[in-house]
Structure formats: structure tokens, C-alpha cells
């Protein structure tokens, strides 16, 4: 999992809140061009995809992190005056198509579908293809799926190369797709051929 039980409970921050902080309260409406929120959404998707695609067992979503629930959970107890205020998940956030939570929820569904499309995915070893700390690029394969990540907040690459098995590659899941709140910088219809 990307987020532990303790992070989502009172006294700590959820992963999305660590990435975006209070900006998610004021800048999570679609079309709001806030760099902190935009970067946090991108990282949230990539962190979850790296985690889900490198595991050898089950992938655990914890109480709303699949759509970036902003607040912690605090069950009624003596220390909070037996309050129910934070003893809930706000599922209405992911259902609201005017807010960015739906991007994260839709991405989560597509990510799970992609991983399930690969037969015996969790039994297939992860094979590192490339990593470059300076470029902040990571690539690995799992079965027939090639995962390529650009973690740089400021650099996009055209014609970036690394060695992969001979063949033709097409994009089946793109964290930068506009459908998931990305910039849409990749041509998802393009077939990438090895040379």
C-alpha cells in the first residue's frame, strides 16, 4: 500500500495531503491552475501505480486514498469528546465531476483494470529496464507491460531512449492523460517501435 493505517488516522496526514497540503481545500476544482495541486495529483497517481505494479500480492487502498480523500479518520473516543465529525469518508467528493477527486478515482479504476489484464501479473517478476536519477526517469517491465515514469516536475522528454526487448509498444495507461487530470503531453495513439 502507499499509505499506512497510521497516516490516514488522526495525528498524521494522508498521502495526498502531504503532497498538496491545504491547497487541496482551495484549488481542487477542475480548471484551477494551481501548481501544487497539479503536481500532487501527478505524484499521487505515479506513487500508486509504482506500488501496485511492483507488488507480489494484493494492492491495498485505504479508506479513500484511491481518490485522494483529504482528511484523516478519527473514530469517536474520549480524546475528541466522542465526536463523529471525522469518522467518515466523503464519497461525494469522488462523485463530484467538478472536482479533481474524480480524476484520481477514475485513474485508480483504470490502473486496476490494466494490472488485471496481464495474466498471472503478481507471479511475474519485475525486471528493471532503466533508471536515471538525474533525469528522474524509471522504467521496468512486468510480463508484457512496460512501465515508464518521468518523475521530473519540470522536464518532459522527446525521443528519450533505453533498451527494451524488440517489438512494438503502445500506451495502455497514461498518468498524464487529460482524462485523469494530466497535461495530455503524450500521443496515446502512437505505436513505439524498437530500433
Task: Describe these PLM feature segments.
Residues 36-45, 50-61, 65-195:
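Carbohydrate-interacting/catalytic domains
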Residues 1-31:
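Aromatic-lined glycan-binding groove of carbohydrate-active enzymes
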Amino acid at each position: 500500500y502507499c499509505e499506512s493505517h497510521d497516516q490516514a488516522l488522526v495525528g498524521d496526514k494522508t498521502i495526498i495531503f502531504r503532497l498538496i497540503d491545504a491547497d487541496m481545500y482551495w484549488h481542487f476544482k477542475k480548471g484551477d491552475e494551481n501548481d501544487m495541486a497539479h503536481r500532487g495529483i501527478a505524484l499521487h497517481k505515479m506513487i500508486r501505480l509504482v506500488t501496485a505494479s511492483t507488488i507480489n500480492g494484493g494492492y491495498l487502498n485505504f479508506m479513500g486514498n484511491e481518490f485522494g480523500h483529504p482528511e484523516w479518520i478519527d473514530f469517536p473516543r474520549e480524546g475528541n469528546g466522542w465526536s463523529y465529525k471525522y469518522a467518515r469518508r466523503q464519497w461525494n467528493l469522488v462523485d463530484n465531476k467538478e472536482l479533481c477527486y474524480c480524476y484520481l478515482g477514475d485513474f485508480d479504476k483504470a490502473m486496476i483494470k490494466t494490472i488485471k489484464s496481464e495474466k498471472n501479473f503478481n507471479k511475474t517478476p519485475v525486471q528493471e529496464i532503466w533508471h536515471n536519477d538525474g533525469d528522474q526517469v524509471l522504467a521496468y517491465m512486468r510480463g508484457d507491460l512496460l512501465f515508464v515514469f518521468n518523475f521530473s516536475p519540470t522536464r518532459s522528454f522527446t525521443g528519450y531512449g533505453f533498451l527494451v526487448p524488440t517489438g512494438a509498444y503502445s500506451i495502455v495507461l497514461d498518468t498524464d492523460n487529460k482524462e485523469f487530470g494530466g497535461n495530455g503531453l503524450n500521443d496515446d495513439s502512437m505505436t513505439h517501435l524498437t530500433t
